[in-house]
Amino acid sequence: QFQAQEEAARLIAGLSLVSLALIFAVLYSRYRSAVLALIIMGNVPLALIGSVAALWMAGQAFSVASAIGFITLAGIATRNGILKISHYINLALFEGESFGRELVVRGTLERLRPVLMTALAAALALLPLMAGAGEPGKEILHPVAVTIFGGLVSATLIDAFLTPTLFLLFGRAPLERLMAARHDQREVTAF
């Protein structure tokens, strides 16, 4: 049994790396920028911190089930960054906002409610699984729920400051490239 569990842990670790690589590839293909993809993926370590803290507070050991929760959480955590970065880009491209603090503050405030609503909905959905830790049938789902809940809380709270700050520090060049590409595309379609 120990050997099977160790093999499953190796498989989950490999799948985790593959899922992170795929998330990066999708983000890169969407934004054409490694910088923007990495800013968005900056939420993943923050989510993992919250997950580990939640597992520790719940008295849960790291398991294959919690590792599956980590993989799920990586996708959920990137969603918040995607919402914000996409909105910053749209404000610049379609509403003529220039890069700067005003764009980032406006974009962050306009996306705060949707981010909080989706995080709250997910957290509320996980509460029944977290409440009955010892009940039959929840042995597998409880660690997954604890992992996702803890990571969701930490990623949502810290992301409110991290993504805007990183975009302000490193987002100017990628945004200008996207704006130039859109301008070039308009000129080509005009002819």
Regions found by a protein language model. Give the residues of each.
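Intrinsically disordered, low-complexity terminal
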Residues: 189-191
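C-terminal transmembrane helical bundles of large multi-pass transporters
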Residues: 1-171
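Membrane-proximal cytoplasmic C-terminal regulatory module of class A 7TM GPCRs
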Residues: 169-187
